[in-house]
Amino acid sequence: MRLKISLSKEPKHQELVSCVGWTTAEELYSCSDDHQIVKWNLLTSETSLIVKLPDDIYPIDLHWFPKSLGIKKQTQAESFVLTSSDGKFHLISKLGRVEKSVEAHCGAVLAGRWNYEGTALVTVGEDGQVKIWSKTGMLRSTLAQQGTPVYSVAWGPDSEKVLYTAGKQLIIKPLQPNAKVLQWKAHDGIILKVDWNSVNDLILSAGEDCKYKVWDSYGRVLYGSQPHEHPITSVAWAPDGELFAVGSFHTLRLCDKTGWSYALEKPNTGSIFNIAWSIDGTQIAGACGNGHVVFAHVVEQRWEWKNFQVTLTKRRTMQVRNVLNDAVDLLEFRDRVIKASLNHAHLVVSTSLQCYVFSTKNWNTPLIFDLKEGTVSLILQAERHFLLVDGGGIYLHSYEGRFISSPKFPGMRTDILNAQTVSLSNDTIAIKDKADEKIIFLFEASTGKPLGDGKLLSHKNEISEIALDQKGLTNDRKIAFIDKNRDLYITSVKRFGKEEQIIKLGTMVHTLAWCDTCNILCGIQDTRFTVWYYPNTIYVDRDILPKTLYERDASEYSKNPHIVSFVGNQVTIRRADGSLVHISISPYPAILHEYVSSSKWEEAVRLCRFVKEQSMWACLAAMAVANRDMVTAEIAYAAVGEIDKVRYINAIKDLPSRESKMAHILMFSGNIQEAETVLLQAGLVYQAIQININLYNWERALELAVKYKTHVDTVLAYRQKFLDTFGKQETNKRYLQYAEGLQIDWEKIKAKIEMEITKERDRSSSGQSSKSVGLKH
């Protein structure tokens, strides 16, 4: 990726340009110390003077009023705030009329920013004050006051907090009066510029110490640059939070959100005092010290999938290269390319007006449809369909171009959605809520309606990243997510009316990805690269989960690596320095998944015998139990040395009735409650009581015996035997109450038990054929 610089031969301003701001993706306003506000039209390459300000007004900062989200009519901003050296800020219309001038600070007003909703304005000045104003320019509050000038300010993503500079310090102050203020030393020199992105919640800072830094919202440094030759005078996030730009003297740099540099340009600009990204995130404008306005297009983005490599060579041209035969195709577009995604044998490209869908089998005839709103901010792909996110909503389309659905939820803000907060599978869409980060919304892909009974997926901590598995049946769909404590959890998407368990799968997990061909999960866990060959093991037999993992040392990937993709058996990891590392994992677990999904158990056993790996046998054991194939489970457990489980499986085979076998398989997986329910529904009350006795669940055993008026003496006898073994006296009041006047006769109890077993066997042989449903022999 690099920047394609365009700079006019002669500067359009006579003095330094202090600030720039985009109205649309093709129109820019610039303000200069020559008191002129100039409009630039990038389509016609024309400039026109909007207004000449009075000679005592030297503009310092400009910020356009945010356009209404999701309203088609208002496609561009209509007014802006301009801060100036005379201590005022001015509300100016698009045509250049000064609507209002407000005395704001003593000395220059160094920065002014609208919040994301456009309901409040924050200004900072040389007097060290931070002030909040209403939309119409009425003072609401003085948020802070200090002895040094405040050079830069930014709103938090939720518009509830403000970030501002204080010399070498950065301060995050909530608008609520008594809330905790976060303050930390960020640079060794005065901080000149800050920016806070609403999508990734990361902070940028630039200082006179010639460094730029990336921080999280808790003030922890994620990246610190090497010192440059000159102070860093400007930084700005791209709207989607994936890139940022850095400006200095004769320097413009394009960086990834993790800090490493994509491209460095040295235009003849003087210091770049202000950087603005276009609304679609494809181009940058810089306000230059020598009167120029520098424009830079982001080109040469690259997408890879299997043997295809797609490169954006120009604004409207892509090159497709097949690395197997070196065949090259050129794709020409009518408009500027904004976003693209290559996955699942399809390339999806959004331009400013249309969406193009190419198949990797045929690059010549794309499917084209018009977009409702031009600026697509996110494209996600699944095997059957893809998702487009723009300022107006979320839209699901098939690869044939057919519109499928558009999920909606209360308080939806599409401008802050990214690949970590939205996930797509063939049947489900998952979206993390921004208002309450502990909640995940789940939607049916085909209808866009909330999944099942509409109940939200709620977690105890804030969630940072979500991912749906890609294969298998809808009823088995799982979602994995990482919370703010870096714990990895997995849970079922379908709830079936019961409270589904959210189970912890790992700790200190920084990044995760599901395989696109089978349900294998990978992540970087602390200093280990970990692959969960069969994550569902946690629901079946968590004792053997460690045996189903593949682990290798991840220290070679340096700090904060990120998993880019997991295609087939190839995992691609982006290191902190920007380099890509490709890891190949064993292809056999994927083949095993394929055999099991087709119920080819004999082939699965044969494969495990051929591979001779413990992880394969452990996966097969868990898969067999999950699918109720106890014959295969017995072979697999024997292969991993779990002899106690082999014996238990043999004991299950000898049980007389189908229901008992089913209940004991459920118990094997730890589903005690479900096992008991199966037995009670089948009328096998004694067996339900007995499993509670075996588990020493004495309260429940007695409760069932009393409720069904049977085997109370059996429960009391086993309880007494248990107490005698440990030499203890009965203290439970309920047991003491029922034991009064009851004589325990073991002969009688054994006869009753024998009668129950005979009754179950007789009922099973008369009511059922010898074939056992749910248990394969």
Swiss-Prot record:
Disulfide bonds: none annotated. It holds the Pfam family WD40. One of its GO terms (biological process) is tooth eruption. Its main location: cytoplasm. The keyword Membrane does not apply. Keywords: Cell projection, Cilium, Cytoplasm, Cytoskeleton, Repeat, WD repeat. It is found in: Cytoplasm; Cytoplasm, Cytoskeleton, Cilium basal body; Cytoplasm, Cytoskeleton, Cilium axoneme. GO terms for cellular component: 9+0 non-motile cilium; centrosome; ciliary basal body; cilium; cytoplasm; intraciliary transport particle B. WD repeats lie at residues 12-50, 104-143, 145-185, 186-225, 227-265, 267-306, 504-542. InterPro entries: Beta-prop_IFT80_2nd, Quinoprotein_ADH-like_sf, TPR_IFT80_172_dom, WD40/YVTN_repeat-like_dom_sf, WD40_repeat_dom_sf, WD40_rpt. The keyword Transmembrane helix does not apply. Component of the IFT complex B, at least composed of IFT20, IFT22, IFT25, IFT27, IFT46, IFT52, TRAF3IP1/IFT54, IFT57, IFT74, IFT80, IFT81, and IFT88. Interacts with IFT88. Interacts with IFT57 and IFT70B. Component of the intraflagellar transport (IFT) complex B, which is essential for the development and maintenance of motile and sensory cilia. This is Intraflagellar transport protein 80 homolog. The gene is Ift80.
